Amino acid sequence: MKIADLDIQPIMLYLPDTPYWVNRWRDGKKHFVESGITDLIEVAGVYGEGFGIDGTHEYNLDNPTGHHKIGVGYTAGFLSMYVMYNVANVLPNSHFMFLEDDTRFNDGWLEKLNLELQNVPKDFDFLFVGSCCAGGKPNTHIGGDIYRFDAPYYPMGGNCYIVAKKALPHIILTQRDAYAPADINLCLHTFPELKVYAILPRLVEQNNNILPK
């Protein structure tokens, strides 16, 4: 898929395991096609309950004595994204757009993305197309609706973002402990060495969920 002269491959994460997840998969594909995405690669993720996954590592950043574990769903989500990054890393494209099945594009998103990709620096590693929790965090305005974020303050969320292939080996190397949800894990262990940007306001929403700005 050519967007602003970049060779961007859309990749969708889905689960084929229960009627609930199959319906989300079907509805997501339908929306993506209607939104102008026709060359989608679909990657089956890790279904935590079906795989018998139970994360044992603790996430204690917010409460050092809490002995908190993120649970089956977040652990499986982390592992699913790790699979996606490895799939992308062997494909020939220069950039990848990672999508969740409940991603919903705003009207005019593709035209806006074409415009904003001309504002983001050509050597970017990671671009949030959709995000949450960016409001109030320090950033640097680059141009148009493009903002750069630096450690330790980053947007959150994983419903739509573009990654340059050159960044994938670093992501794969640094995402090796499923103790924290995937987006938090990126902020803590991966983003400090990457050039991270966001389009604000975001171009996508999450189906049936109002995300904080």
Feature names for model-found ranges:
Residues 1-99, 103-213:
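An acidic/histidine-cluster motif and surrounding catalytic segment
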